């Protein structure tokens, strides 16, 4: 039975692409999409939405709207892509016209949610990217990577700042290297929730076989 207070985002293809350069066989993709549709997953993150690269990468590192339109997407889930925040900041600096080069307005896209992944220490640099995506009609999520080991004050001050922007719909924290234990998850959730009132999510890794219990703790 689905808990209506919890939304499940599946990022198997986006995260799994590190093993095959995001070059997935179409038959596998079709089977995967059918499976997640039957599993009551709420959101499917299809891949990255990256800037052009000089080396070969499969289509799911770009996950363009034209490419997505060729897929047989079930109607039930929402669909998402992820941006590597550092990539956009390093390559474009303050020029956010790059966002408009790779995103259409939401009304012309099958993507509903864009997640921006960025190191905890560089979160303040993500505001302009998120604001432009919001203006284009997308739901926008912040995925804080390398979020482990900060002080309660750091978490609270970060939550205050991003709440004040009004550009993020969801806040995620990632167990980037898989070393969080439940007490770490509890600390982060409690600290962020003091100043963040919108949905809060966790991206757990299973290095210590704690992904499930960490998710339940969150």
Describe the residue ranges of each PLM region.
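N-terminal small/glycine-rich loop or linker at the start of catalytic domains
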Residues: 1-21, 75-78, 85, 109, ...
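Conserved N-terminal beta1-alpha1 strand-loop-helix module at the mouth
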Residues: 3-47, 52-57, 61-73
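Alpha-helical segments flanking ligand/cofactor-binding loops in enzyme cores
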Residues: 34, 131, 160, 190, ...
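A structural motif
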Residues: 41, 111, 167-168, 197
């Amino acid at each position: 039975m689905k808990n209506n207070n919890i939304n499940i985002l599946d990022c198997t293809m986006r995260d799994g692409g590190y093993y095959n350069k995001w070059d997935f066989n179409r038959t596998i993709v079709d089977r995967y999409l059918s499976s997640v549709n039957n599993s009551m997953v709420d959101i499917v993150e299809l891949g990255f939405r990256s800037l052009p690269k000089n080396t070969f990468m499969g289509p799911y590192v770009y996950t363009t709207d034209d490419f997505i339109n060729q897929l047989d997407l079930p109607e039930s889930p929402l669909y998402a892509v992820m941006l590597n925040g550092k990539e956009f900041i390093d390559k474009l600096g303050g020029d956010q016209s790059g966002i408009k080069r790779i995103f259409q307005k939401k009304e012309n896209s099958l993507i509903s949610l864009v997640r921006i992944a960025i190191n905890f220490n560089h979160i303040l640099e993500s505001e302009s990217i998120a604001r432009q995506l919001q203006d284009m009609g997308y739901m926008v999520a912040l995925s804080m990577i390398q979020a482990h080991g900060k002080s309660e004050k750091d978490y609270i001050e970060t939550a205050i700042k991003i709440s004040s922007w009004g550009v993020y719909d969801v806040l995620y924290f990632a167990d980037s290297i898989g070393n969080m234990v439940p007490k770490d998850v509890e600390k982060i959730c409690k600290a962020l929730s003091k100043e963040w009132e919108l949905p809060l999510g966790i991206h757990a890794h299973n290095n210590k076989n704690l992904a499930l219990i960490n998710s339940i703790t969150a």
